[in-house]
Amino acid sequence: MVSPLAKGLFQKAIAESGSLYFPCRSLSTSHHGEETAEDLGVTFAENAGCASLAELRNLPADKLVQIADTADSGNFYKKSDEIVDGWVLPDQPLMISRRGEQNPVSVMAGFTANDGSVVALLGYAADIPDTAEAYTAEIKKRYGDLADKFLRLYPATDIDGSFYNALRDRSFGWMSESWVRHAAAVGAAAYLYYFAHIPPEGHVLAPIPGSDRQRPNGAAHGAECLYVLNDLESSPLSAEYPPTEKDFAMAEIMSDYWVAFAKAGKPEVDGLPAWKPYRNSACSYMRFEDAHAHPGENLFPGMWELMDEDVNRRLALPGVGRDYYAVGVSSPVLVVDQNYKSD
């Protein structure tokens, strides 16, 4: 979407796991105190005992993988993801999109109701306070003038639910809606979806990492994929949790929309509710739940604005770092002085 090298090579895109709007590592400039990609490469080469690119290229593939996934190599495998190299990626993807310089193709993007569960597995749920008072105090300490907005969206009346929803919105929600917003801003057809249909295994209780509490799996990360593919019975869970008539109906509806978009760049299906394109004024979206498609406008009012300001502060404040999953009581302190100006 944001690489000039891909211009004219594709006409449409579907994103079901957010977008690359978190800060990427740069080739030769350090950000947030992290190593540059070149520094990582030097450490990796030293650990491999190679003094040149030619020597690295002569290493067997299995040896490269073995060396890459070690602490001595700076965990190269885990850190050498997308690199702003000035060629494939000329700048941070978020900044390219905010300037309207991305490839203007049709876009469909969205997220699930319990997308936050996959982020919780990274360890952030261990920080959830036990009381409403402690939760509120942590939010006020970390968010300052944004605390009231945060608490309206993620109240202390349901601490676990609020924390999971904040994880969802901070990552997949904000990223997905940002993607369609930026596409719409350059005149491309853009469509936002929200998957809240509970799959058969969604009622199973799952432990909250770092605690002795549990909550239902719900519509977890990736739960929409088998519905989109209309292939529910291929799930390894289908024997223990067989799909119901509602599940099959939901799969038929979603796959019809996705196929229509893949064919023509518009999810228009005869006999199904009209899926309006996202506009930054109306913020149209489609919610998939209980075997039906429900068109709506302005999903989670105030969420995108709060999370976008959260991003701006992380980018502007020194020492905050690039860990964008840390949200709520796990967030860095985002309090700013009166001279701060948002993008």
Predicted segments — roles?
Residues A291-D343:
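Tryptophan-rich aromatic "cage" segments
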Residues A48:
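Ligand-binding beta-strand-loop-alpha-helix segment within the catalytic cores
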Residues E16-E34, G41-F44:
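Active-site-proximal cap/loop segments of hydrolase catalytic domains
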Residues S3-P4, D231, F261-E268:
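Generic structural signal for alpha-helix termini and adjacent loop/cap motifs
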Residues M1-C24:
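Primarily recognizes the serine-hydrolase "nucleophile elbow" in alpha/beta-hydrolase
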